[in-house]
Amino acid sequence: MKAYQREFIEFALEKEVLKFGEFTLKSGRKSPYFFNAGLFNTGRDLARLGRFYAAALADSGIEFDVLFGPAYKGIPIATTTAVALADHHDVDTPYCFNRKEAKNHGEGGNLVGSELEGRIMLVDDVITAGTAIRESMEIIQANGADLAGVLVAIDRQEKGKGELSAIQEVERDFGCAIISIVSLTDLVTFLEEKGTDAAHLESVKAYRAQYGI
């Protein structure tokens, strides 16, 4: 685990974006942890968040032309990531996001920002069922662009309804790389290194043993 990944977990815990306990997911599973990126909700939070996304992009080595943030949660993520790439990596990247409903006045259409062209890096908070990615792919393909990859904050590394995770299903269906700032494996490593949350560590390990990929 790299320094920025450890710092991201500490940041998420500090802001209570990442919590340990017992949580019922939409799937009905009881999870020992929960991640709610909507709680990164101040200017300073977003500035820090963008730096972590930018660090993960730089670390990945994936080449892309435009950042795309799917409405709604992906919009501030794409914006702050573009700023962080410019400020901290000297990379001036165009960004774009979609509207849920197309406008028929002014500039019109359902896209805001740069042209959606070339190789697209999609940024979002998490992938649960992959629905947002599939909807975004329709937009990307309709504009004649290609999906270079997807970056999310956390990869839960757990099975969906079948043997694959939602992320693995997206990788299989669209042939693109899915990267994350951190993964469940990183979370376990963090708890092991910290050594003060034995109960949480054991519950996360048990969950991984049952649902992990």
UniProtKB/Swiss-Prot annotation:
Orotate binds at residues 34-35, 128, 156. Pathway: Pyrimidine metabolism; UMP biosynthesis via de novo pathway; UMP from orotate: step 1/2. GO terms for cellular component: cytoplasm. NCBIfam families: pyrE (TIGR00336). Its EC number is 2.4.2.10. The keyword Transferase applies. This is Orotate phosphoribosyltransferase. The keyword Magnesium applies. One of its GO terms (biological process) is 'de novo' pyrimidine nucleobase biosynthetic process. One of its GO terms (molecular function) is orotate phosphoribosyltransferase activity. Catalyzes the transfer of a ribosyl phosphate group from 5-phosphoribose 1-diphosphate to orotate, leading to the formation of orotidine monophosphate (OMP). CDD domains: PRTases_typeI. 5-phospho-alpha-D-ribose 1-diphosphate binds at residues 26, 72-73, 99-100, 103, 105, 124-132. Its cofactor is Mg(2+). Keywords: Glycosyltransferase, Magnesium, Pyrimidine biosynthesis, Transferase.
